[in-house]
Amino acid sequence: MVKWRNNMNINELKKEFIKIYGEGSMRNFFSPGRVNLIGEHIDYNGGHVFPCALNFGTLGCVRKRKDNKVNLASTNIPLKVSINLEDIKYEKKHGWGNYPKGVIKEIIDKGYKVGGMDILISGNIPNGSGLSSSASLELLIAIMINNIFNDGKLDKVELIKLSQKAENDFVGLNCGIMDQFAVAMGKKDMAILLDCNTLEYKYAPVDLGNYVITIMNTNKRRELSDSKYNERRLECEKALKLINKEKKINYLCELSLEEFESLKYLIKDNRVLNRATHVVYENERVKRAYYLLSKRNLKEFGKLLAESHFSLRDLYEVTGKELDAIVGEALNVSGCIGARMIGAGFGGCAIALVEKSKLDLFKKKVSNNYNKIIGYKPGFYTSEIGEGTYEI
């Protein structure tokens, strides 16, 4: 489990690197975590999402080697992994190391240059929190390889796709493209309105005025592979097949609300209908959120966050008692104008939009009430909106 630290020091990491790998020059990189403001479980349904990069994430130091060996070490986890570039395969015992291995393999398979490296990473994104520790690590490695071996000339969107492919095909976890996109393409004080179908995107300035986005960690770990994530994807595919009897589309999110309402009679299974309803309406909420933030209408934006959570709870059924408790308690506190779960669900984190002057009281009340309901306390992190992966 990653130990939470509010600030990572690159100089400390450099010293650790020298202890492990010896004296010499090195290059240093940072890759953020991400939070999706709204638009949950629709990235794999061709929908719009609205993520931003955080100002905490994963630091990495790297040095080129003269051979084909890659050494991976972390300050967070004792496990060290060494691989040969000519023989990269998934090995369960390599744990976290499979994420960098997957990215390296995908880049090699594309015919791009990769050489031997000594790498040390240090992250402060809690594992299983839903803040994209895996995408942060994947893009850290991808941008390292781009800058060190390819003069920074590789297309960033291609690196995003290769990182997603590494997680899907090499590690074997289903994920949409949003996490990698937000981590790589984030800009300070901007959210990204991303069409996951076409990868068209535009930036929206996020001016929260007297409010702050607070991340609330239920402290219940979320395991993607153990969750019902894959089951939900299959249910959405069922809905899509049924809709396709009348209207040929590639993704549910291609439907407008009016089109969906006129075609939903094709879906007889109530559970499958609920999943599809969430997807289509959530996609509309994202577009409205973009508009509301551009007008700085924070109160209405906050209401959309709550609507999103209730839909994820009642229609998509991916919240669970911990997320429902923390969001419910947040919405009951004066000064909070919106809250919702983020990530895949079944644990992990939620976000709340809270008045800055009431933040300390908010955290105290939510923490105490959550503890009464669940039996242990949550964690709180406040982050600014930061830059995508970069070389320091």
Swiss-Prot record:
What the entry lists under HAMAP family is as follows: Galactokinase
* InterPro entries for this protein: Galactokinase (IPR000705), Galactokinase_bac (IPR022963), Galactokinase_CS (IPR019741), GalKase_N (IPR019539), GHMP_kinase_C_dom (IPR013750), GHMP_kinase_C_sf (IPR036554), GHMP_kinase_N_dom (IPR006204), GHMP_knse_ATP-bd_CS (IPR006203)
Q: Which PANTHER family match?
A: GALACTOKINASE-RELATED (PTHR10457:SF7), MEVALONATE KINASE/GALACTOKINASE (PTHR10457)
The processes (GO biological process) annotated in the record are: galactose metabolic process
Q: In which pathway does it act?
A: Carbohydrate metabolism; galactose metabolism
Q: Keyword annotations for this protein?
A: ATP-binding, Carbohydrate metabolism, Cytoplasm, Galactose metabolism, Kinase, Magnesium, Metal-binding, Nucleotide-binding, Transferase
Residues at which ATP binds? 74, 128-134
NCBIfam families linked = gal_kin, PRK05322.1
- Residues the entry annotates as binding substrate: 40-43, 229
Can you name the source organism?
A: Clostridium tetani (strain Massachusetts / E88)
Q: What is the lineage of its organism?
A: Bacteria, Bacillati, Bacillota, Clostridia, Eubacteriales
Which is one GO molecular function term here?
A: ATP binding
What is the name listed in the Swiss-Prot or TrEMBL entry for this protein? Galactokinase
Q: Which residues are marked as site: Transition state stabilizer?
A: 34
Task: Please indicate if the UniProt record lists Cell membrane as a keyword.
Answer: no
What subcellular compartments does it reside in? Cytoplasm
EC number in record: 2.7.1.6
